Amino acid sequence: MKENNNAEILELKKQFTALQQKCGAKTDTIVRLGQDLEKSENEKKGLAARVETLERNLERSERELQLVCACQNDMKIKFGTERQDLIEDIEKYKRENQQLRTDRQELLDQKADLKKDCKTFRQTIAQFEVEKMGGPVRNSFSTENDEVSKLEAHEKLQAKCKGLESDLRSMLGIKEELLMERDEMQRKVARLSNELSYLLNGDPRRVAEDLDSLVAENRFLKAKLNTAEEESESIKMTLAKYKQMAEAVNVQTMVNRSPKAGEGDDKPSVAVINMKQIRELLASHAIELVESDYRAITTILLDLCNDKQMALAHSRRANKVLGMRLHEVESKLAVLDIKSRSSSPRHELPRDEDIELVVPKAVASTSSK
């Protein structure tokens, strides 16, 4: 009977041990399944966060694309207007050049006519001089009235010749000026043609950015010069004020050091200059202050406050100028970046239908589920 009971107990122990092992295995399986489930949940959250990030990136890219398209349209409109203006300027300069050429031809014709007139007048003067030199052998019946009339005619012709010579000199001067203006206009037309070709071809040698940078630099230097002048004036005023204060302090020190009726050397003289001395003076109990000392301290504190306010105003003005300069530089850099991207064929912007978002397969399957 006991042997049977022992056998049953052993059998029950074996079964209990086997059940414990099975229970441990099931527990391990459940723990592993829980870990796998938690890991899957974490992966699901990470994929969801990645999907949200990609969606935000897509929205931001779309907004940036819209801004770039708007900037490109503005640049196209501005380029069209600038091109039209340059074409109109070139046409106007061509017309002016043609007008100058016609004026030059007219001046040349006038010069030729004046040369012919001068030649005619020289021949007339020479003939008259020959006739005058042959006066002693002329006929005896020539009268004195004929000589007077010939002299008057000769004087008139000489005055007219001098007037024509002066007109010729003035015409030659006008011709030289017109030639200089024509050469200057030709150089200007050539320069504008080069600038137009640079602008049309997108050449980096175009002068638009350089002019803008020069104008901005000039504005910045002008503001800086005004600030320096204001600071110089404020420094001069401060120096004059401190000079007056030093003179007043010296006078007050001399008065306090002089002997007074009813007072000895028990009360020391007070001369306050800076904040450190003011603090030490107010903190010390060995010095007795009167109403005049408090007034002097108040005046010095007020002057210090005014100086601080003036320095703060100057620093704010300088910061404002620097901020404007920084804003201009940033805007110029942005415009240059957009121009370089739009001008180079390697940075052509894709169309709306060519933009695709590459999403991993795992993310796509998770989002579809």
Swiss-Prot record:
Keywords: Cell projection, Cilium, Coiled coil. InterPro entries: Coiled-coil_dom-contain_pr_149 (IPR019179). Residues 1-249 form a coiled coil. GO terms for cellular component: ciliary base. Its main location: other. It is found in: Cell projection, Cilium. Expressed in amphid and phasmid ciliated neurons, and also pharyngeal, touch receptor and motor neurons. It comes from the Eukaryota. The keyword Transcription regulation does not apply. Belongs to the CCDC149 family. This is Coiled-coil domain-containing protein 149. The lineage of its organism: Eukaryota, Metazoa, Ecdysozoa, Nematoda, Chromadorea.
